[in-house]
């Protein structure tokens, strides 16, 4: 999101100011909410989360899972950082850069707005929505080559195979599908029309999770459990040897 101005000397301030315009534009972005969305995976995820969550949020999760048209429930979920991304696309400012000298009126100001796009919503659709929100205050451009895709269907054969594999290493563990506000190589496969699912046989405690750290590692038991998990999962999906 960027703004531009002729600039000038700070001793001669004017009403039009690139930084002020950007601030006003970001205030509008902050207030904007994408339309509520859902799919089979998120409804199953929120139903189970609601059963395990108490209070107002737990009630909202259960209500939304039962009726995703429940606007009041969606509003409560939107206030939860942990779950808002399971009900809609989110956009948030993450970086700012503006001005070129401490004693000069800014000629430009730029903000990076990071969007996590809900499967089924198009990248250009989000850009146009943000441009409509900021109006003439700023210009909204895409950075990089972002992609979007439709969600993969919640296939019963995949759920059955994953459940079997999980219970092979952790008997009695409930298996609940979920959607995360991130991305993986699965995005490329889904965009090509190939149903894709992220699964893992790695179980660990919170204090054993060093993901993306310099000391990223698995416990020894998790390594061997994962080998068994993948063997069961792949052989189930591939079928018997012929």
Tell where the protein language model's regions lie, with residue ranges.
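An extended, acidic, His-containing surface patch that forms the Zn2+-binding/catalytic region
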Residues: 35, 39-103, 107-108, 119, ...
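Flexible glycine/proline-enriched surface loops and loop-helix/loop-strand junctions
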Residues: 2-9
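Hydrophobic residues positioned within well-ordered beta-strands of beta-sheet architectures
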Residues: 111-113
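Hydrophobic beta-strand positions in extracellular immunoglobulin-like domains
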Residues: 3, 115-117
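A short core secondary-structure module
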Residues: 11-35
């Amino acid at each position: 999101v960027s703004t531009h101005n002729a600039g000038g000397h700070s001793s001669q301030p004017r009403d039009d100011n690139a930084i002020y315009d950007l601030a006003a534009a970001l205030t509008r972005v902050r207030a904007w909410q994408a339309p509520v969305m859902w799919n089979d995976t998120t409804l199953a995820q929120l139903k189970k989360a609601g059963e395990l969550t108490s209070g107002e949020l737990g009630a909202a999760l259960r209500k939304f899972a039962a009726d995703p048209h429940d606007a009041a429930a969606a509003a409560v979920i939107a206030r939860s950082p942990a779950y808002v991304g399971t009900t809609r696309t989110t956009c948030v400012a993450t970086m700012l850069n503006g001005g070129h000298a401490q004693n000069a009126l800014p000629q430009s100001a730029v903000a990076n707005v990071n969007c996590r796009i809900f499967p089924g919503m198009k990248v250009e659709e989000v850009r146009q929505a943000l441009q409509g929100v900021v109006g003439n205050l700023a210009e909204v451009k895409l950075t990089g080559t972002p992609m979007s895709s439709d969600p993969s269907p919640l296939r019963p054969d995949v759920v059955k195979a994953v459940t079997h594999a999980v219970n092979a290493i952790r008997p009695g563990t409930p298996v609940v599908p979920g959607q995360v506000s991130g991305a993986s190589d699965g995005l490329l496969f889904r965009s090509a029309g190939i149903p894709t699912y992220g699964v893992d046989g790695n179980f660990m405690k919170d204090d054993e999770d060093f993901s993306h750290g310099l000391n990223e590692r698995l416990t020894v038991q998790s390594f061997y459990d994962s080998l068994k998990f993948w063997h069961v999962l792949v052989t189930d999906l591939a079928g018997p040897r012929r």
